[in-house]
A protein has these predicted regions:
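Short N-terminal targeting/anchoring amphipathic segment
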Residues: 102, 167-183
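A short, glycine/small-residue-rich beta-strand->loop->alpha-helix junction that serves as a flexible
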Residues: 103-118
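Short beta-strand/turn micro-motifs composed of small residues
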Residues: 104, 134-136, 178
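Short acidic, S/G/P-rich loop/turn micro-motifs used as interaction or catalytic elements
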Residues: 106-110, 156-157, 182-185
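N-terminal strand-loop element at the rim of the active site
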Residues: 126-159
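Donor nucleotide-activated moiety binding/catalytic core segment of transferases
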Residues: 155-171
């Protein structure tokens, strides 16, 4: 049942009034049920970001409740998989500035997230040593925003999260900033 709900929640485009109504009905019913799922092992977790993101297109006041439930399941999944949070009592500096690690989604020159956030991140370099972390989609313009850029190379979510944690620990990051959450699995999992 949860897999079917994931599949029905994931499309970006809902082309008929009837389909829109059905998705809205699911958004009212599903969060409470989703919150009871122990982990992501038996649901199509590869489309979790679609469930997370596309609820925003509904009109109900509580349309985002599915995010809360999904976050609860993700957190349990991470902990069951052996995840431990980073020790944030050890903060470092680089050239007298605190370190800000920025986890990116779709941060390339032709995407709106680049256009809306690159100038503020460039300005943040005055007060922070800025480290960008992202995948191959981050183009040269996106990488140039940062003092340094690290490409996430992991082949699964745990390896990507561990790589991100290593970057934060090695540099004593004072801030982990995600300018967007929901277009990619990595940011959703990192927020948990």
């Amino acid at each position: 049942c949860a897999s079917l709900c994931f599949a029905l929640q994931s499309p970006r485009f809902i082309g008929t009034d009837q389909a829109f109504s059905k998705r809205g009905t699911l958004l009212q019913w599903f969060p409470e049920k989703l919150a009871t799922i122990e982990n992501l092992n038996n649901v199509p977790s590869a489309i979790s970001h679609d469930v997370y993101m596309h609820c925003s297109y509904d009109i109900a006041e509580n349309k985002h409740w599915v995010k809360k439930a999904l976050n609860q399941v993700i957190r349990r999944h991470l902990l069951k998989g052996g995840w431990t949070d980073r020790d944030v009592t050890k903060l470092g500096e680089h050239n007298g500035k605190p370190v800000m690690v920025v986890l990116l989604e779709h941060f390339h020159s032709s995407h709106s997230i680049y256009r809306t956030h690159s100038t503020s991140m460039i300005a943040a370099r005055e007060r922070f040593h800025l480290i960008g972390v992202g995948n191959e989609a981050v183009d040269a313009a996106g990488q140039a925003v940062f003092d340094e850029f690290h490409l996430l190379k992991g082949d699964n979510i745990f390896s990507k999260l561990n790589e991100l944690k290593e970057i934060c620990e090695k540099n004593g990051a004072a801030v982990l900033y995600m300018p967007s959450i929901g277009m990619d699995l990595t940011t959703i999992f990192a927020s948990n």
